[in-house]
Amino acid sequence: MTKITVFGMGSFGTALANVLAENGHTVLMWGKNEDSVKELNDHHQNKRYLKDVVLDSRIKATSDIKEAANFTDIYLMALPTKAMREVTSEIDSLIDSKKTFIHVAKGIENDTFKRVSEMIEDSISEDHNGGIGVLSGPSHAEEVVIKQPTTVAASSKDEKVSKLIQDLFMNDYLRVYTNNDLVGVELGGALKNIIAVASGIVAGMGYGDNAKAALMTRGLAEISRLGEKLGADPMTFLGLGGIGDLIVTCTSTHSRNYTLGFKLGQGQTMDEALNEMNMVVEGIYTTNSVYHLAKQQNVDMPITNALYKVLFEDNPVKDSVKDLMGRDKKSE
């Protein structure tokens, strides 16, 4: 079967490494934390992220990035968006042949407003680029790793890469569709994190189902507006990489973005909430990026604007809700 390196030892990278191993592939994980590497090699666990799960014993781990980079020609990039450019640049300096990069990050770069596939493309030389794709959709790691039925989308500018992703990951509990709209799938995965934080705030404040439904619906509308302006197919946002990912992230306590929002809605400061969670919350960085990107593109994104004021200007959550509800009359 196929050899694959998984860069990143977070919850989703670990869950997908387990899928790949169970599908018969040879998997090497890379991470910087020596304790996590040792724990995985010795005990087949990653307790920090997937506390009670015993992983496939065939998964190995290393902290040596050169070993990881030269293990195979296929990489699963399971890193936070803010770490992607640095790690892919380092990988590029260590390899001498084409590699296929599959990423699962859901974010937008702060300074450049680039999607993750664009960041990877920037970071590697042309003669090392064997194709770049994304695997995205409603897929909590905690459910994937215990084989709960899950359905996701694989996308790339190169259809061969989309089909490769489908072939590598698909099994009887993980169904993978291909989708040729890379822009839409990446934007859907990133932008829904903004709405998920807002959804958590609404829940934390004690508002009911009406408010939650309105937030998700109007959130999808502003995601679609920006996506279409950036070249995405609006129909993509009605699929797994759009509304599918939006629903699961806006309604589940598995979601870091929702959990952060919930804590903010209950009155915690962002520092207090993040200290309790001790995990990367992509929605914070994405809100910052998209707030400025929307202004640059002249796209109306009222929920994003309101959340930006909460996260970065210390606007009270009650005032932000009042501002949203008090906007001028308009047609849907």
UniProtKB/Swiss-Prot annotation:
Keywords: Cytoplasm, Lipid biosynthesis, Lipid metabolism, NAD, NADP, Nucleotide-binding, Oxidoreductase, Phospholipid biosynthesis, Phospholipid metabolism. GO terms for biological process: carbohydrate metabolic process; glycerol-3-phosphate biosynthetic process; glycerol-3-phosphate catabolic process; glycerophospholipid metabolic process; phospholipid biosynthetic process. InterPro entries: 6-PGluconate_DH-like_C_sf, 6PGD_dom2, G3P_DH_NAD-dep, G3P_DH_NAD-dep_C, G3P_DH_NAD-dep_N, NAD(P)-bd_dom_sf. It is an enzyme of class 1 (oxidoreductase). SUPFAM superfamilies: 6-phosphogluconate dehydrogenase C-terminal domain-like, NAD(P)-binding Rossmann-fold domains. Its EC number is 1.1.1.94. Pfam families: NAD_Gly3P_dh_C, NAD_Gly3P_dh_N. It is found in: Cytoplasm. GO terms for cellular component: cytosol. NADPH binds at residues 11-12, 32, 106, 141, 256, 280, 282. The active site is at 192 (proton acceptor). Catalyzes the reduction of the glycolytic intermediate dihydroxyacetone phosphate (DHAP) to sn-glycerol 3-phosphate (G3P), the key precursor for phospholipid synthesis. Belongs to the NAD-dependent glycerol-3-phosphate dehydrogenase family. HAMAP family: NAD_Glyc3P_dehydrog. NCBIfam families: PRK00094.1-2, PRK00094.1-3, PRK00094.1-4. This is Glycerol-3-phosphate dehydrogenase [NAD(P)+].
